[in-house]
């Protein structure tokens, strides 16, 4: 008997796939998807042609009823992103002083057709 996955999981996977394709169109190489540590996750880790690692949180909202996709990125989520990025650098790269940055990629509307925005995370 086939099992069905909740719509949110399908939407999340579709949003992350579209985000990865967009980052690749910018010349980046996707080096990791869904990097998890206890209490945190980075949706996409990519490398720019110049070598900078970019840690991307993907957020998608089909409807604005509960706020925008960007509104769903809380200070707590940003702190967890920082922690996960530092863990990635030390564990996967062996050092924490590599050029890197955090960003949020939002999709407003359906995952495959909604408006896409890429925003740098300050700090």
Curated annotation (Swiss-Prot):
SUPFAM superfamilies according to UniProt: Restriction endonuclease-like (SSF52980)
Pfam families: UPF0102 (PF02021)
Transmembrane segments: none
GO molecular function: nucleic acid binding
Superkingdom of origin organism: Bacteria
InterPro entries xref list: Restrct_endonuc-II-like, tRNA_endonuc-like_dom_sf, UPF0102_YraN-like
Similarity remark: Belongs to the UPF0102 family.
HAMAP family, per the entry: UPF0102 (MF_00048)
NCBIfam families named in the record: PRK12497.1-3 (NF009150), YraN family protein (TIGR00252)
Protein name: UPF0102 protein DR_2282
Organism of provenance: Deinococcus radiodurans (strain ATCC 13939 / DSM 20539 / JCM 16871 / CCUG 27074 / LMG 4051 / NBRC 15346 / NCIMB 9279 / VKM B-1422 / R1)
Origin organism lineage: Bacteria, Thermotogati, Deinococcota, Deinococci, Deinococcales
